[in-house]
A protein has these predicted regions:
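A short beta-alpha structural unit
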Residues: 39, 140-144, 164, 179-184
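Amphipathic alpha-helix from the class-I
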Residues: 134-154, 165-170
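Conserved PLP-binding catalytic core of the aspartate aminotransferase-like
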Residues: 155-161, 169-184
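Active-site phosphate-binding strand-loop segment of PLP-dependent enzymes
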Residues: 7-63
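Helix C-cap/helix->beta junction micro-motif
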Residues: 2, 56-57, 170
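Active-site PLP attachment segment
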Residues: 75, 81-117
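A short glycine-threonine-serine/GTX helix/turn-capping micro-motif
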Residues: 105, 122-131
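Substrate-binding/gating loop at the entrance of the active-site cleft, primarily
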Residues: 1-2, 15
Length: 184
C-alpha cells in the first residue's frame, strides 16, 4: 500500500540492519519495523540495539507486540519493557486475539502526531469497521487482569518450564528460551 523504498535485513542481525540504514540515508524517513517476539521460534528482538541504531541513523522504531503483549516483561508490557526501551519505541502494534483473550481487533499506538497521520493516511484504517462493544469489553478486562497481578504470567512461565522439561525428557531438541512459544 505504500510506495516507500523497503530494505530487508537478516532476522535479528544488527550488522545487516546497520547496512540497510546506511543504504537508506538518502530516504526522507526511515522506519525500522520488527516483531518484539518472533512467532516461529520465540526469539526476542534485540530492541535495545535496534533503538541505538535508530538513534544513530535518525530512524523511527515500530514494534509488533502480537506475541508479547500481556505476558512478556515484568508487568506484561511486552518486549519493550523486557528490553528496557520504554519511551524509545515510536509505534507499537498488537492484537487482542492472542494473549488478551482471543477478542477480535488490534491496536496501533504512538505519539499523537503519528497516530493522527495514520488515521488520515492509512487506507486500511479508513475503510475498516469499529470493534464490537463486547470484544472491547473483553479486551479491557484482559488488560485489567494482567495489569493487576502477575499471577497469570507467573503460572504461564511455570507451565512453559514444565512443558519444555517434559519435551526434553522425551528426547526433543529445543531452542533455548523462556518464551511460551516452544518450537519443536
Amino acid at each position: 500500500l505504500c510506495k516507500a523504498a523497503r530494505y530487508r535485513y537478516i532476522n535479528n542481525d544488527m550488522a545487516d540492519l546497520e547496512r540497510c540504514l546506511q543504504e537508506a540515508q538518502e530516504q526522507r524517513f526511515r522506519v525500522i519495523v520488527t516483531d518484539g517476539v518472533f512467532s516461529m521460534d520465540g526469539t526476542v528482538a534485540q530492541l535495545d540495539k535496534i533503538c541505538d541504531l535508530a538513534d544513530k541513523y535518525d530512524a523511527l522504531v515500530m514494534v509488533d507486540e502480537c506475541h508479547a503483549t500481556g505476558f512478556v516483561g515484568k508487568t506484561g508490557r511486552g518486549t519493550i519493557e523486557h528490553c528496557d526501551v520504554l519511551g524509545r519505541v515510536d509505534i507499537i502494534t498488537g492484537t487482542l486475539g492472542k494473549a488478551l483473550g482471543g477478542a477480535s481487533g488490534g491496536f496501533t499506538s504512538g505519539r499523537k502526531e503519528i497516530v493522527d497521520m495514520l488515521r488520515q493516511r492509512s487506507r486500511p484504517y479508513l475503510f475498516s469497521n469499529t470493534m464490537a462493544p463486547p470484544a472491547v469489553a473483553g479486551a479491557l478486562k484482559a488488560i485489567d487482569l494482567v495489569s493487576e497481578s502477575s499471577t497469570l504470567r507467573d503460572q504461564l512461565r511455570e507451565n512453559t518450564a514444565v512443558f519444555r522439561e517434559g519435551l526434553e525428557t522425551h528426547g526433543f531438541e529445543l531452542l533455548p528460551g523462556e518464551h511460551p512459544i516452544v518450537p519443536v
